[in-house]
Design a protein with these regions (language model features):
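Loop/turn elements at helix/coil->beta-strand transitions in domains of secreted/extracellular proteins
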Residues: 7-9, 30-32, 57-58, 88-89, ...
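Bilobed "Venus flytrap"/periplasmic-binding protein-like clamshell domains
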Residues: 1-13, 64-134
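A structural signal for short loop-to-beta-strand junctions that line the ligand-binding cleft
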Residues: 52-65
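Conserved residues at beta->alpha junctions
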Residues: 17, 95, 141
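Pocket-flanking alpha-helical
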Residues: 12-53, 126-131, 147-155
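Pocket-lining segment of extracytoplasmic ligand-binding domains
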Residues: 49, 115-182
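Solvent-exposed coil/turn segments that connect beta secondary-structure elements
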Residues: 31, 38-41, 67, 75-78, ...
Length: 182
């Protein structure tokens, strides 16, 4: 659309390592525009999380694609019902370089857990939710628009349920992380 409607402007899509890398690419001027999600842009501008080594960036938003929702799902028959219940479990945490992992680290911290307390599998969302439906992982996560296509596909074959944060965890997250909202 840009190439067709914005005279003198050309855009060429390139494959990157994902929404975690894209702010770094824009900051280093390797690319002019990159796509990421709200929580990662907040972390990048503050220079925290995956951007701690680089430091604060001065990124600007051109627009919004959709709200990102962290889908934390397990089989309806699972004993997992809270973030704390994830300890020691096999979790599909999304693809390497994707936006789920930094967000997941924040959520786990609210239950005094780290990613080291899980057995993480770095899988594309569709593969992770397929593995959940096949009972090869205990839970699967996807940071995407709602509803996530991978969730809908798995839900067609298995009954799923959300893994909830406690009301206290939600209030702490809202106060601690500016990238959270109700």
């Amino acid at each position: 659309l840009v190439n067709k409607h914005a005279k003198g402007t050309t855009m060429v899509p390139i494959v990157t390592q994902g929404s975690v890398e894209n702010p770094r690419l824009v900051n280093s001027k390797e690319v002019d525009v990159g796509i990421t999600n709200n929580n990662l842009s907040v972390l990048a501008n503050k220079g925290v999380g995956p951007y701690k080594k680089i430091g604060a960036m001065e990124l600007r938003a051109l627009g919004s694609l959709h709200f990102s929702v962290l889908h934390m799902m397990t089989l309806d028959s699972s004993s997992i019902s809270s973030v704390a219940d994830l300890e020691g479990k096999r979790i599909a945490v999304g693809p390497a370089g994707g936006g789920t992992i930094p967000f997941l680290k924040q959520v786990l911290g609210l239950a005094d857990l780290t990613i080291d307390d899980l057995t993480p599998s770095l899988l594309a969302y569709s593969d992770g939710f397929s593995q959940l439906a096949d009972d090869n992982v205990d839970a699967a996560f996807a940071l995407s628009g709602y509803p996530a296509g991978a969730v809908m596909q798995a839900k067609a074959n298995k009954k799923l349920k959300f893994i909830a944060m406690t009301p206290e965890q939600v209030e702490i997250a809202l106060g601690k992380y500016s990238n959270y909202n109700k």
